[in-house]
A protein has these predicted regions:
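Extended beta-strand/beta-hairpin segments
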Residues: 1-48, 56-132
Length: 132
């Protein structure tokens, strides 16, 4: 899977497109009321990416196990300091609605945590290269 995300920022306007292989989807994120910056920070989007990735992976794995899940809430937190500093203290919790046995739910949560792609990308580290 080839994944990409693009952002074109102009005064009071953002064009955002995310793409998986050849499937593109437009997204809306408002700019700040005055200026070029986004109303949502990159740190907030990173944590949303982790929550979304866990959620999608969780539902996929629940379906493989034929588990009925009626809802899931995932909350990620992290600390970010001054410009240039990396984030720290990333933690999360997941709460779900299901009539499945609690031991099976806990097993699925732990399994999903181990195999979640976005989590593992950050846990194992990734190089980022600026190209021209």
């Amino acid at each position: 899977m080839k994944i990409s995300a693009s952002l074109k920022s102009n005064y009071n306007h953002h064009d955002i497109v995310v793409m998986t292989d050849e499937t593109a989807k437009e997204m809306q994120i408002s700019p700040q009321p005055i200026g070029f910056r986004s109303s949502v920070s990159g740190a907030e989007l990173l944590l949303l990416s982790l929550a979304t990735g866990f959620c999608n992976d969780f539902y996929r794995e629940a379906a493989k196990r034929n588990m009925a899940i009626s809802g899931l809430e995932v909350v990620f937190t992290g600390e970010f300091g001054e410009e240039g500093e990396q984030g720290t203290d990333f933690t999360y919790w997941a709460h779900l609605l299901s009539d499945e046995p609690s031991s099976e739910i806990e097993d699925l949560i732990q399994y999903t945590d181990r195999i979640a792609q976005i989590h593992n990308t950050l846990r194992k580290g990734v190089s980022i290269a600026l190209t021209s």
